[in-house]
Amino acid sequence: YNLFGQLSEILTKEINGKTLLADFSLSNQNGFDTKEYYTDETIIYNNKSHNPQVVTDKYSMNTVYIWGYNNMYPIAVIKGATMSQVSSILNEIDKLESMPFPTLATEELYRRLSYIQGALVTTYKFNPYIGITNCIKPNGESVTYEYDSFSRLTSISNNTGVLNKYYYNYKK
């Protein structure tokens, strides 16, 4: 855990098949040798917002998160890229994350980040305190979410048409 109590690393220990789970207890009384453990994930947090910034899985695949709306919602998730690759394309990441509303349109953000060779980019647009309004997936598909005046999801659609519609019927 880091200084803010957030999970920073996940370790796995392989044990022989004869040990019952009920008999297994993790003790750090005398310290433990981390060489016996395998790192499943490493999480690096943003120093200012304390949001996850880079998650590295056990195969060393990075996922970079860019936050927006005053660091409340993720506006981009980039799999297969490093933070330095993302920073070289978006030199205003800190500014983007601290703005109440992103200064880059979702489409422009997606277009810029798609230049990272081999990366899978997903971008998001939100209506704060209501929900997601748009998502552009790695394959370029744009999905739109619509809400009613009570902030309830009413429809999900993409380039081909309406995927789902939601109706809220009340008994009188």
Language-model features: where?
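Beta-strand elements of repeat-based all-beta scaffolds
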Residues: 1-57, 61-137, 142-172
